[in-house]
């Protein structure tokens, strides 16, 4: 079922999606702070590897207790570059740790989320990576501009 098919399910489905997204954002902020602290006891790449290893253990545990689908099915994905998500994740972990250490959690997360928003919208506009292409909407452009202005205001002393 595609993204647009799921949207038609109604308000409850969207509300659950909103709730999950809010939890995700909160967990990402907490994880970034935790990872930055772990780095202080070791090194950034050791901390990043530990983070990825613990994520692997949790994912295997969740797989064992839930769906038990064939793990080799993941290799059927096309195009194959989609399998680079884990490698990208390693660099995400690294850049989150570095930015939180250098800027502090609030500034770093604000910039990270704004960058995510802008890149995600560009992906939708251009239909990259198999995402359904969306038309330009002024209100979304203005929303991104407001986010950027928010960064300037937040940083302003």
Model-derived regions, located:
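C-terminal transmembrane-helix exit sites in multi-pass transporters
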Residues: 118-138
């Amino acid at each position: 079922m595609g993204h647009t098919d799921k949207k038609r399910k109604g308000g409850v489905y969207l509300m659950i999606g909103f709730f999950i997204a809010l939890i995700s954002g909160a967990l990402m902020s907490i994880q970034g702070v935790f990872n930055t602290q772990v780095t202080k006891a070791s090194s950034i790449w050791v901390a990043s590897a530990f983070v990825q290893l613990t994520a692997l253990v949790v994912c295997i545990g969740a797989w064992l207790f839930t769906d038990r689908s064939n793990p080799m099915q993941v290799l059927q994905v096309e195009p194959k570059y989609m399998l680079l998500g884990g490698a990208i994740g390693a660099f995400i972990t690294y850049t989150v740790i570095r930015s939180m250490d250098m800027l502090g959690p609030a500034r770093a997360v604000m910039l990270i989320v704004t960058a995510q928003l802008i890149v995600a919208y560009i992906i939708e506009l251009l239909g990259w990576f198999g995402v359904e292409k969306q038309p330009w909407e002024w209100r979304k452009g203005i929303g991104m501009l407001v986010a950027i202005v928010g960064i300037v205001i937040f940083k302003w002393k």
